[in-house]
């Protein structure tokens, strides 16, 4: 039985050429497109128009930074043990982007790609993209993202469904819920949506690691957690 040919449609290169998604990298892309637009090209196979670019970049910017989150702490702790391997520390932080943090964008996009019937969606015990421990009753990131969506003509049925779910459940529509809906408005494959968060948060983690190198806090976190967590086990003085 003949083997299936190995095939990739993303890019090719020769001695003097590099072509990405049909675009000449040095001649058409370098110096002409921003990182968000390049990501859009990689994901969809085409460059975004001006309005798509504005919205997609807004989505990515939203997920770059959110303080000392579990992903940032994981990256810093890994960097403490292996300061020579920034890539390992970034990878450690990215590994925590799942169904609870950042990666919930994927759950929202998958859910909405299957149906926008709010009554049907309400049958789910848990709806991704709703609720936030800090930002309530309104997530300011969601408000701004939907403003950009309206300004670019991308506020549609997916956004409306999430806002209605938020209202009916009386839970904050968080930024990942908004981004999952907006990814659907842009026609993105739901399987790529978590990747937008991974791409964005990688940038933020590099910032955390540079700060850790200049202004370390990981050792202090470790020592204080160790002291508090085991305090009840130690003999009283």
PLM regions and their residue ranges:
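Non-transmembrane, aqueous-exposed alpha-helical and coiled segments at domain scale
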Residues: 1-237
């Amino acid at each position: 039985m003949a083997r299936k040919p190995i095939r990739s449609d993303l890019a090719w290169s020769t001695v003097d050429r590099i072509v990405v998604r049909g675009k000449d990298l040095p001649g058409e892309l370098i110096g002409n497109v921003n990182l968000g637009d390049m990501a859009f090209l990689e994901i969809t196979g085409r460059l975004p128009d001006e309005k798509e670019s504005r919205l997609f970049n807004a989505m990515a910017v939203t997920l770059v930074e959110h303080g000392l989150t579990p992903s940032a702490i994981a990256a810093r702790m890994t960097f403490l043990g292996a300061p020579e391997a920034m890539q390992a520390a970034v990878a450690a932080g990215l590994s925590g982007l799942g169904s609870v943090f950042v990666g919930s964008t994927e759950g929202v996009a998958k859910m909405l790609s299957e149906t926008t019937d709010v009554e049907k969606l309400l049958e789910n015990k848990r709806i991704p993209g709703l609720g936030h421990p800090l930002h309530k009753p309104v997530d300011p990131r969601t408000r701004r993202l939907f403003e950009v969506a309206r300004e670019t003509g991308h506020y549609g049925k997916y956004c409306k469904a999430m806002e209605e779910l938020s209202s009916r459940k009386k839970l904050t529509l968080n930024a990942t819920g908004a981004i999952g809906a907006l990814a659907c408005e842009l026609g993105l494959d739901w399987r790529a949506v978590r990747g937008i968060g991974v791409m964005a948060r990688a940038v933020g983690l590099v910032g955390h690691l540079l700060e850790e190198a200049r202004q370390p806090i990981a050792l202090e976190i470790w020592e204080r957690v160790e002291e508090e967590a085991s305090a009840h086990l130690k003999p009283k003085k």
